[in-house]
C-alpha cells in the first residue's frame, strides 16, 4: 500500500458540487480531468435535460469508457 506522503490535494467542481480529491497526480491534472468530466456531463445534460444526477454520472462514465476503449484499441493496433 502506498504511503500518503506523495499525495497531493485538489478541489474541483463538477455539476455544481465541490469535491476534495487526494491523488498522486498534480492538482493541475486532476482539475483537467474534472473539467473534462464536467464538459461531458454538460453535453449529455443538454441532450437529456431530465436525467437525474446519478443517471447523468453513470451515462457520462459509460461514454468516457467507450471513448477510452476505442482509443486504446487504436493505439494497440487492433
Curated annotation (Swiss-Prot):
Pfam name, any one: ZapA
Biological process (GO), any one: FtsZ-dependent cytokinesis
Disulfide-bond pairs as recorded: none
Keywords from the named record: Cell cycle, Cell division, Cytoplasm, Septation
CC terms in the record's Gene Ontology section: cell division site; cell septum; cytosol
Chief place of localization: cytoplasm
Localisation: Cytoplasm
PANTHER family: CELL DIVISION PROTEIN ZAPA (PTHR34981:SF1)
Family recorded in the similarity comment: Belongs to the ZapA family. Type 2 subfamily.
Subunit architecture: Homodimer. Interacts with FtsZ.
Protein purpose: Activator of cell division through the inhibition of FtsZ GTPase activity, therefore promoting FtsZ assembly into bundles of protofilaments necessary for the formation of the division Z ring. It is recruited early at mid-cell but it is not essential for cell division.
Name recorded for this polypeptide: Cell division protein ZapA
Source species of the chain: Shouchella clausii (strain KSM-K16)
Gene: zapA
Amino acid at each position: 500500500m502506498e504511503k500518503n506522503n506523495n499525495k497531493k490535494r485538489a478541489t474541483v467542481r463538477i455539476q455544481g458540487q465541490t469535491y476534495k480529491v487526494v491523488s498522486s497526480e498534480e492538482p493541475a491534472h486532476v482539475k483537467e480531468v474534472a473539467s473534462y468530466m464536467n464538459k461531458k456531463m454538460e453535453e449529455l445534460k443538454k441532450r437529456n435535460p431530465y436525467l437525474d444526477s446519478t443517471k447523468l454520472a453513470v451515462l457520462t462514465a459509460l461514454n468516457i469508457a467507450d471513448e477510452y476503449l476505442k482509443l486504446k484499441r487504436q493505439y494497440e493496433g487492433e
